[in-house]
Amino acid sequence: MIASTMDRAEVLRASTGDFPLQEVRVAVGGREWSVLHTDAVLSHADEARFLGDKKDRLPYGVALWPAAIALAHEVASRAGAFRGARVLELGAGTGLPGIVAASLGARVAQTDRQEVAMSVCRRNGERNGVEAIEYRLVDWAEWDDAERYDWILGSDILYGEPAHPHLRRIFESNLAPGGRVLLSDPFRAASLRLLERMEADGWRITMAKWSVGEDEARRAVGLFELAPPADANP
């Protein structure tokens, strides 16, 4: 269930300008979540409009994408696995999956390279009563985190092939023994190519499918769980 509301307009002030924020309420895991975002990109038509509007200077990452909603549902469905777990969210955007994980008792670090995304993540955590989250402004190409995590989360982060080597390095370096990567993706060709290469290299990948949206605007999203090769985390 997804419901938009515009009762109170908010503006995000950042070094790159002012961004009007909308609110949407999303039902996940038996409760309703209030999510601030710059645009809801839920259907194929939404995406074509959003990406095709050359006048739109809004950052892509702070839109609400279907993959984030699907990943939040998947996290909520695995509540026991996230309780007490150390979680890294990559390209957090609006932050919904990590916020849901933190509400279940996970210790969450949300990361993004966009200042505006980190600000929106923090606002969304606070407005939902989830404040015990660490926020880090970081670029994958300059990644220096040596910590190990039980879960690495990412929603629709595989679309850019130049980023694939950086993401693989993070997956390989930052998973704790027995840890898993959990990714959501609307079956983008570039994403599937990376997953196929990783599977060929020994990663064990399982997939589930979620459907996000309503009626004819529903969007299929794949949920991919990645386990490293047996010798990746000795």
Regions of interest found by a model, annotated:
Residues 1-234:
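S-adenosylmethionine-dependent methyltransferases
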